[in-house]
UniProtKB/Swiss-Prot annotation:
Part of the 50S ribosomal subunit. Contacts protein L32. It comes from Ectopseudomonas mendocina (strain ymp) (Pseudomonas mendocina). The keyword NADP does not apply. Belongs to the bacterial ribosomal protein bL17 family. NCBIfam families: L17. PROSITE patterns: RIBOSOMAL_L17 (PS01167). This is Large ribosomal subunit protein bL17. It holds the Pfam family Ribosomal_L17. Transmembrane segments: none annotated.
Length: 128
């Protein structure tokens, strides 16, 4: 029975899923806009938003938790120094998912995942 089991498998092992979402979260925090498939985008929200919530309170313990989940010192620095302060007054909803059509090869639904209130200087072409 699958009672209370949430989340998508995405045809991957649990280790592959964990590594994939860790890499996607790091890319999202680095570029603030990424393009991926719609199911991956919806699952990424469950990984990335708690990290931003964690970054709103700067402590050594929270930094260690964030490093454990991202494995990137640069991203931990950006989370706590930039993103945590940017979203200090926002109670959740840090990501925006925008549908952007279908992929040419396999017709998979695609989506942009971006951080809300990000600087406007970034371009959509950089996400591709």
């Amino acid at each position: 029975m699958r009672h209370r089991k949430s989340g998508r498998h995405l045809s991957r092992t649990s280790a592959h899923r964990k590594a994939m979402f860790q890499n996607m979260a790091v890319s999202l925090f680095e570029h603030e806009l990424i393009k991926t498939t719609l199911p991956k985008a919806k699952e990424l929200r469950r990984v990335a938003e708690p990290l931003i919530t964690l970054a709103k309170e700067d402590s050594v313990a929270n930094r260690r938790l964030a490093f454990d989940r991202t494995r990137s010192k640069a991203i931990v620095g950006k989370l706590f120094n930039d993103l945590g302060k940017r979203y200090a007054t926002r109670n959740g909803g840090y990501l925006r998912i925008l549908k952007c059509g279908f992929r040419a090869g396999d017709n998979a639904p695609m989506a942009y995942v971006e951080l809300v209130d990000r600087p406007v200087g970034g371009s959509v072409e950089a996400a591709e």
